[in-house]
Regions:
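Signature of N-terminal electron-transfer/Fe-S-associated modules in redox systems
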Residues: 1-154
Length: 154
């Protein structure tokens, strides 16, 4: 476990803990690690992002090493390992969206919100992130806000 100073320990609310325990039961004995992604989603729903304390907590629930959780949480762009705004705007930056002009959309959003890519607006409402493929290549440029796709952006 990574020790941090002045940070409150993370624990699921009773409702989320019950949900986590129910999710874990879907996997056979010895294969509970397979519940990692859904538990990370639960943790991020509760915290608003993925603090180290939440990753350590999930590792404890699954009886796995914290590094195993860190590897997964840092691999997927859907998990925010730094604090983010209330609304995260994720803009696809891969080939098809790039060819269709995502840069102009990204630059316009950043200018309007007064942030750089990866930054959060002064009021804490918006974070703009570039992400890898959102799997909507035929509808680019694409961005996602709160798990809702916005396609054919101009």
């Amino acid at each position: 476990m990574i020790e941090t100073l002045d940070k409150a320990p993370f624990a699921f609310t009773p409702e989320r803990l019950a949900r986590a325990q129910e999710i874990i039961t879907h996997y056979p004995e010895g294969r509970q690690k397979s519940a990692l992604l859904p538990l990370l989603h639960l943790a991020q729903e509760q915290a608003g992002w993925m603090p180290t304390e939440a990753m350590d907590y999930v590792a404890g629930l699954l009886n796995i090493q914290p590094i195993e959780v860190y590897e997964v949480a840092t691999f997927y762009t859907m998990f925010h390992v730094e604090p983010v705004g209330r609304h995260v705007i994720e803009i696809c930056r891969t080939g098809p969206c790039c060819l269709l002009g995502y840069e102009g959309i990204r630059d316009h959003l950043c200018q309007r919100l007064g942030v750089d890519v990866g930054g959060t607006s002064a009021d804490g409402m918006f974070t703009v992130k570039e992400v890898e493929c959102l799997a909507a290549c035929g509808m680019g440029p694409v961005m996602q806000i709160r798990e809702k796709y916005h396609m054919h952006l101009t």
